[in-house]
């Protein structure tokens, strides 16, 4: 739209949406705060009630919620696992102050997210950003209905996590032999032995354990990874007692085609209800890959607010799929997440300002720059 003023663009965009989708109007007004109602009124966006649609407006973000999904095979509810505080921040070169991390997590806890991965109980020699794991775990306010898992690569880390108050843990494996040696300094087989000790101890204490499989769609050292290899590692983790296996496109090279082939293989051994996907957006395929997974029966998705992240052992890998962008897509599909998009955007704005970064979320960029 060239040099058209942003306010005019805003009005034109909404008017186009009105012509194409016929929002409901007055019945929504009571659910909006005065500022949101004023914005809608000024943009002349209220229209007669049309059954089948509903609108939620947060700041400058308007999401059309379809009552019935427009695509087949999608779940009604999608659980979002927010990994920003751990996977998102671990690659930041400048150490983020502990009080900022705590405030960040507390803000995320007020968004409706039900799972927030808090930190990693790893050696500070390997991941300096996570050196304050105990202080962060003890410092956050744990909200009712929100789970706060932590990453524990070995038995020592597990015991430290439990002492700090952790009630859920995760272990981080790989489908690539080279990546396993670079990331956790041992072979896949050796890592499985360590994880078995951790998961066994966790089960003994009634602490749920989640398993990650990195490099599920490609490795920075080995290139392509066969679906069979991903299946083997996933089956081992599931068999030792991990209640959920998160399949990670660590370097973001996957496509809907490779996602489909990988999931078809893994789902022969593990039910879709025990699987999650964890997509990085290096090649801009994350949302497309997630949609493919949803259509195949997956209903758990990992993401990071503002698209935070990367990988210290995968040069050039971009951040995780942005939680804001994921929610926007899911809202548009009529899928319930229970998460407030605007509050997530606020949390993202907070952490980006704190670490002096620009958000990688397209939704946040479009909204805050409108």
From Swiss-Prot:
Q: Which gene encodes it?
A: HMGCLL1
Cell compartment(s), UniProt: Cytoplasm, Cytosol; Endoplasmic reticulum membrane
Q: What membrane topology was assigned to this protein in its record? A: Peripheral membrane protein
What EC number(s) does this enzyme carry?
4.1.3.4
* Record-listed substrate binding positions: 86
Q: Which residues are annotated as active site? A: 311
Which lineage?
Eukaryota, Metazoa, Chordata, Craniata, Vertebrata
Consequence of changing residue 278 to R: Abolishes catalytic activity
- Residues annotated for lipidation of the kind N-myristoyl glycine are 2
What protein family is recorded? Belongs to the HMG-CoA lyase family.
- Cited Gene3D superfamilies: Aldolase class I
What the protein does comes down to: Non-mitochondrial 3-hydroxy-3-methylglutaryl-CoA lyase that catalyzes a cation-dependent cleavage of (S)-3-hydroxy-3-methylglutaryl-CoA into acetyl-CoA and acetoacetate, a key step in ketogenesis, the products of which support energy production in nonhepatic animal tissues.
The UniProt entry, under PROSITE patterns, shows: PYR_CT (PS50991)
According to UniProt, the reaction catalysed is:
(3S)-3-hydroxy-3-methylglutaryl-CoA = acetoacetate + acetyl-CoA
Q: Which residues form the Pyruvate carboxyltransferase domain?
A: 78-345
Enumerate the cofactors the protein uses: a divalent metal cation
Any matching Pfam family: HMGL-like
Q: Name one GO cellular component term.
A: endoplasmic reticulum membrane
InterPro entries per UniProt = Aldolase_TIM (IPR013785), HMGL (IPR043594), PYR_CT (IPR000891)
Superkingdom: Eukaryota
Q: Which GO terms describe its molecular function?
A: hydroxymethylglutaryl-CoA lyase activity; metal ion binding
Keywords tagged on the record: Cytoplasm, Endoplasmic reticulum, Lipid metabolism, Lipoprotein, Lyase, Membrane, Metal-binding, Myristate
Which pathway features in its UniProt record?
Metabolic intermediate metabolism; (S)-3-hydroxy-3-methylglutaryl-CoA degradation; acetoacetate from (S)-3-hydroxy-3-methylglutaryl-CoA: step 1/1
**Species of origin:** Homo sapiens (Human)
What name has this protein been given in UniProt? 3-hydroxy-3-methylglutaryl-CoA lyase, cytoplasmic
Which GO biological process entries does UniProt record here?
A: ketone body biosynthetic process; L-leucine catabolic process
Which residues are a divalent metal cation-binding? 87, 278, 280, 320
